[in-house]
Amino acid sequence: MTSNDVRDILSLPERPASQPSSSAQASGSSSRNRKSSGSNNPHPSSAASASRPKPKYDGMTRELFALLGDNAPSLAMTHGLDAEGKPVMGLGGLFKPKFKRRKEKVRQWRWTPFLNSARDDTQIDDDVPEINHGLILHHWAPARSFSTTAADGISAEDADIDTKYQYAAFNTTSGVYSYSNDEYIQHLRDDDWTKEETDYLMELCTAYDLRFVVIHDRYDWAAAQASFLAGSTSAVPQPVKERSMEDLKVRYYAICRRLIRSRISTDDVETRQMLLSTYAFDKQREVERKKAVARLYTRTPEQLAEEEALYVEIRRIEQNEAKYASEREELLRLLGGWESLPSSSPHAVAAAGSGIASLLGAEEDSTAKGRAGSANKKRKLQQIEDNGTPGADDAGSSTGATAAATSRPSANLTSKQRAELRQAQFDEMQCIVRFASNANATTDASAGGIAGPAAVSAASSSTRPPYAYLVGTASTLPAVTSNPANPTSGHGVYLRSSRMLAPRPNLVLRTTQVLSESDPPVGPRLIFPTAKNVEKWENLIGAVTTGLEMRKQLERVNAELRIAKQRIAAALHPNRMADKSEASAEAVESRSAAPTENSIAATTSTHAQITIKTE
């Protein structure tokens, strides 16, 4: 407890700042001694830090602020910010101030009359208040606005009437069109409408602010015509026609469009067209819309349930759209035929499904011919530069067969071609297949180069039919894709029988069963896996799996077709389908309840045969 606490408890006045206490003097002298004795200490003591004066914050008691201890105050307390981050003077702004009564006198409100200048039946003149008249309304208003004294000749009651209504400026109208007699005669004549009835319609539109529901309810041309004939002696009565709301709208909007077209305006063409479009009205469409709404509100519970079922079915179809699309593509690929496809690319599959595979094949043939012609020209120029013998053109135009290559004279072949020929003959004798890059193999095969079976097989790999239901690597494709950046890279030696196409796991059993049921039966494995045998085996497995999938798709489509026919028949003949279902149920019950004589005889003969065999 410090001296300040004691003074606070005893309610003593605070010590003046010029007269420090003895304890403070003693503490000051001791602190000075410690400072002089320990001037070389780089870390000041905690007592020295505690003796530092702390800033005083207004708006918070000393005890509450002492709870902070040695902790630093928050930024809001330091900078004097309130709870919303607004700067205030001192710490008192952190707390909600107490309620302070305003020193001004409370305003008085009076129930006072006023005139609305926006009304047509109200006339207001500030210069001559005596002639002000109209519907007097009342509202609550401050009394100070009516503290003026009454003028001479004006009663106190009239002086209290407020003539400046603050909400009169917000009164707006729809801008109903008006016309003159000349405009009506020149542009607005109609055989179905008289001028008097048209004027009556425009008056109602102005009175009810184009609210056609109210206008149609208040429309009574028979009574209006009677009053008009009573006031005029030369008018001839006309037959009164029944007018619907659509008839009133058609007449009003037609008048507006004709007036817009006939009147001179400074607006451009686009503005006038937009203005005309705002007054467009289609009577037939409006009638059909109202009929549709009436039918919508008169639906039965059965129709509502059917509509809900249709909505659920549509949502289900939308959710399964991706699945149906994939099944459709698969079915088109099956119907298009896998044998007619030149390659397994997505474009070729789509072309086969849409029936344009022939066009795609023609384009590929023309492209291949163009590549072959350019390759022949390059090879001819290269041979002329090497040997100066243009006779090598015959070798470049060959089909690439080995027998044709051996029949050529060796004088027309270069050293590179002779080496390729010897290598091709050796590979053919030893049944060796060498895979080259796809680009080089395709170019050499199309150009007729002598690369042997390797080039032929590599080139034919791009024209192999796709096997949609086989997995693995085809025998005509390398096990590892060659890298064009590194032509010398390749794969190791492997057995051809270890890399063959196989059916999918879900088709293995059915494929094996179909092969065993064939004539002659075919085993599940290939005995002599040569290159030709492997290729034929893959063709056979691909045909079997494709046929199985096609049969599965056919059964599914037939089942869906049968269900659709049953639904159509049930929708067209509901009573007949109910009779058939009842008849079939009765037949099943009769067969299960009472066996026929034939079944009893058959059962008896069966028992007799079993008895004879056992004896």
Curated annotation (Swiss-Prot):
Residues 185-256 form the SANT domain. Signal peptide: none annotated. One of its GO terms (molecular function) is transcription corepressor activity. The keyword Transcription regulation applies. It holds the Pfam family SANT_DAMP1_like. Residues 595-615 have a biased composition (Polar residues). Component of the SWR1 chromatin-remodeling complex and of the NuA4 histone acetyltransferase complex. This is SWR1-complex protein 4. The lineage of its organism: Eukaryota, Fungi, Dikarya, Basidiomycota, Ustilaginomycotina. The gene is SWC4.
